[in-house]
Amino acid sequence: MAEIIQERIEDRLPELEQLERIGLFSHAEIKAIIKKASDLEYKIQRRTLFKEDFINYVQYEINLLELIQRRRTRIGYSFKKDEIENSIVHRVQGVFQRASAKWKDDVQLWLSYVAFCKKWATKTRLSKVFSAMLAIHSNKPALWIMAAKWEMEDRLSSESARQLFLRALRFHPECPKLYKEYFRMELMHAEKLRKEKEEFEKASMDVENPDYSEEILKGELAWIIYKNSVSIIKGAEFHVSLLSIAQLFDFAKDLQKEIYDDLQALHTDDPLTWDYVARRELEIESQTEEQPTTKQAKAVEVGRKEERCCAVYEEAVKTLPTEAMWKCYITFCLERFTKKSNSGFLRGKRLERTMTVFRKAHELKLLSECQYKQLSVSLLCYNFLREALEVAVAGTELFRDSGTMWQLKLQVLIESKSPDIAMLFEEAFVHLKPQVCLPLWISWAEWSEGAKSQEDTEAVFKKALLAVIGADSVTLKNKYLDWAYRSGGYKKARAVFKSLQESRPFSVDFFRKMIQFEKEQESCNMANIREYYERALREFGSADSDLWMDYMKEELNHPLGRPENCGQIYWRAMKMLQGESAEAFVAKHAMHQTGHL
């Protein structure tokens, strides 16, 4: 092995000598490169091989290549690239070949190889890398697409790209993505040929090229792919995706029309078809010769387009009265409603239309809970409180057991400054399961804090603590304690703490809050701090090493602390803490003793 490593290092010497001779690297730097290269060579030549060693080797060589480039730019020297860079690139390719042969299944390794070749190697080399990768990973359509796009865009070889797509489709005859990219590629190829022909005609050059046949220039190959693909892959979604691609190419108007007509003929029972047809009306310009120029005229024109869209949607919900179809309709209305406009006329029309469609869909009970929320939130954002409340009320009628729906309704009522909010909170709790009520209790308490007396707010917290049990009550207790300190100061917070100190479960934060409140007082009482720590350790002393450490620091740093208690606290901690917590405590204590914590 030593002989192989020595031989490979000797192979490097000519390039390293050149680097030193032309002044890109100093003698000391060359020695450092040789030492590092020896270490890397050893790791990839030993009997037990690790992928990370190959990756590190390649990364080092890439860093070296980039450094050489930067130094060349700095001194303005561009010669000897064959002896230097090309030699390094060739060596890296060899390492990649070994690694990809050993770890064939690692797609990321292959992609790194491809990325390296794109930047540093020749196009011929990259073509071979793609072939080797696809021979092993033929089951991954994305890799076929990547290779074909490279052939088309970088090598400018549409024939090679076409052959790759055809091979890929033999492996994946039902892959929509492959058909879409192949379809796009043929349209791009036709567009490129049209531009070439146009340039030749401008230059008055008579070039005979069979590729310039009228069929190819019109996108006949793309049409064949379209026909074959839709016979295999059913559904409006795929059809629409092909139409969207075709619309990117101005010359393919006939193809666009055929796809559009087929979509309407074959998929009338799919909401996506109707949705697409309706939205297409936004793109169709007015038939009048004069385009609108004033802002008002433009707003009127946009309004007309939206009316045409809605006419299609109205026909759609009559033909296909399903939840999915109504979802498309209300989503369109909501998108237009939230679209920014300076026209009061247009905003008013959009609001009116959205509410009309909502009422119809609600009456038929063909909207999901998510759509009630979406619509109500949007209306609330734009301060249409009356309409937002209408939607929220309708939503709670249908989804009485939804906590978020009730919360939304109550949020709208709070924004509207309704006098019946407390009563409506009570009503919500009648319909909801206790386990989903926590956000509503918190909302009630927050609203009460701003709108009601301190006694009323405390009554809400006390009610909530009786109703909310388990882990949810932990959050509520923390909120209650925070409110007590905000509204009544330390005295009130301590009273609340005392009243709750036996009402398990707790969180560590509950006790830490009280410790912090105590420390914020002018006459900070160390006895109280010890009490809070002791209560916290009773609950969490077997698992929380930080709590023990903080207790010891408090005794050491507080003016009224007793440093002599630290030894006893340490031994108590060692008895109570278990497993990893005990190890963590010992490590933290040692760091503290040495002044590192």
Swiss-Prot record:
Task: Kindly list the places in or outside the cell where this protein is found, as annotated in its UniProt entry.
Answer: Nucleus, Nucleolus
What is this protein called in UniProt?
U3 small nucleolar RNA-associated protein 6 homolog
**Where are the annotated HAT repeats, by residue?**
121-153, 156-188, 304-335, 488-520, 524-557
GO CC entries: chromosome; nucleolus; nucleoplasm; Pwp2p-containing subcomplex of 90S preribosome; small-subunit processome
- UniProt xrefs under SMART domains: HAT
Single GO molecular function: snoRNA binding
What functional role does this protein have?
Part of the small subunit (SSU) processome, first precursor of the small eukaryotic ribosomal subunit. During the assembly of the SSU processome in the nucleolus, many ribosome biogenesis factors, an RNA chaperone and ribosomal proteins associate with the nascent pre-rRNA and work in concert to generate RNA folding, modifications, rearrangements and cleavage as well as targeted degradation of pre-ribosomal RNA by the RNA exosome. Involved in nucleolar processing of pre-18S ribosomal RNA.
Family designation: Belongs to the UTP6 family.
Assembly description: Part of the small subunit (SSU) processome, composed of more than 70 proteins and the RNA chaperone small nucleolar RNA (snoRNA) U3.
Q: Name one GO biological process term.
A: maturation of SSU-rRNA from tricistronic rRNA transcript (SSU-rRNA, 5.8S rRNA, LSU-rRNA)
Major localisation: nucleus
Output the InterPro entries linked to this UniProt entry: HAT, TPR-like_helical_dom_sf, Utp6, UTP6_C, UTP6_N
- This protein's UniProt keywords: Nucleus, Repeat, rRNA processing
